[in-house]
């Protein structure tokens, strides 16, 4: 590239974005403006050298407004102090608060922030550059940031370059050049000088342009980035009218590389363990909350009570970060105040887990006396209602008996049960005893009900939930009955009688999906997803196959996780260890399964790049609505229009 052309390219390159495709058509109600603002002039001029003033002024051909300027306008090098950005009539004025750096190219990437004042037509991909030295750096690096766990495009994430190739640069120094991802996860870092770089992505919570907080989402690339450029040719088309081509012209343009950098964003596991709070909403239960999981339960010592065999301990997450203590003894839960010491593992200033003891005074938000008063008031109110109804009874009508308070039980037993499913009994408090001899599960055989065997056990994650397993014969009818008083709760209430009738689905109501997987690691599993990207089932990949049986008709997606450590779950990354998150791949289509059908799909997990794998139907991060005003009737378009603006370069 000739030196003069290279020097002017970065500044004059705005012409690539200035004259975007525009046409004027006529519809009912008159002409509709689709034309974005056009650049007229600027101070300094585009590509100016040796510029040393902090103010930038850009003028357009019409009145303009700015859409989310602090979010959409990206300035390189990044500014520590927030610049002042405002629109004034036909001008955009930016005043930098930081001192200008010597021999540095400054780039202002406006994205689609500049819009005409009336219709909101955006001037897309507009950027502006000047240099404080005698050279204007003009190369660019582009790519995509995806959520490493689910390949969702990450919007609004900062992406930056470091010429300092040391690992510590990301954690100690601000980025040298930056870009920001759009709604498709795409980014472009402009005004880059020749050289070698490391590239990172960062959700910059403290706005210091460095990875300084463990809660920040990050991404890093294992490879060194070396920007380059090449000349390419493309065809531009001019039109006589909406249907007739005038001329097809080949134009040369400069393309910047790399343009396909892929960054997989993740948040590191936080190992900062500390006690968060104690809570006692009701007299019978108090809870301890910690900021992170622990391998062991805290050691609890009662100071105004005996803690031995005093509680039923519930761990709803199974990870010891939330612990519920159900108090067994009525004398104990009648106390308004429970004083105790707890010893637990705490993360010290050296990031080491050490024992720590805190003293707590856990007060009941609802005291026992107040609870009993509320119950008595509710009972008296109910009694008054009963007295009113009694007075209205007609001769011969029988008064309803006073209701008995039973242990609350929620029974999951759908009327049409899946052949692989099971029944569930959920309680509002721990269970003290269960008499399974009072449980009766029967199958209808030739019009007669016959007892069938079942397994009944407590759920492994929830001590207040119990599951009943049996072999359901497809298409057959069942009844499940529990005698009254078969179950006693921790606080003395008994269950009412239970009766549920249901029928197992027929095999022809199901379909199957079989994946023949190519390219997966030796340890991998596939998650079957619903239309909202939620996991329905998980199966391991065995001999290159992942099979899903007994599926209800519907739409399904699938993702594969290369399970590097073989623990059966997706694992995040760690920057200090230079460990990337485990790889995730999506089957690139949503499958529609019909009843009584089998689908066999060949799946080469690397056939498409990661940014093209996840089906749009499963994405939660949708592309922003195109703000360009589309012609409402292409057949009525009048006059000549250029479908291609003849841009001289691309990113």
List PLM regions with ranges:
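N-terminal targeting or signal-anchor segments and their processing/structural boundaries
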Residues: 2-651
